[in-house]
Structure formats: structure tokens, C-alpha cells
């Protein structure tokens, strides 16, 4: 699956996107754990639940199952004005 990082999140990860195998994360909760382990500086943001996740361009909830073909976008809250 492909993970895409946006805004200041990609500054923390130092990459815009990466590919991971499904065996690292079968659902969104497992993916969050994987990301925290790989990028510890994101932990405080994950714990506050301020990051937003979209799977194949649809907002996702924690227990959403993942597939190898999925594209996951991770981004901060968006505000307008």
C-alpha cells in the first residue's frame, strides 16, 4: 500500500510517500502503530488524534481494514477562512 504524507507531516517523516507491505498493518489502528514506531515525533499528534486519514480518498476510521492496493493519505486538519 502507498502512504502519502502532507503539510508539516512530511517535514517530520522527511518523505512525501512510501510503500509498505500489508503484513505491517492490516487495519488503520495497526498502521498508526507502525507509523509511530517508525516516526516517533508523530506520536504526540497521533495521541491527540489531530491527524486525519483517508483511504482511497475517503475519510477513514480506526478499525478500517486495509488492502495492498490502498492509498492512504495522512494530513493535518484543514481550516478555511
Residue ranges of predicted features:
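Ubiquitin-like/PB1-type beta-grasp interaction modules and other compact soluble beta-rich domains
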Residues: 1-79
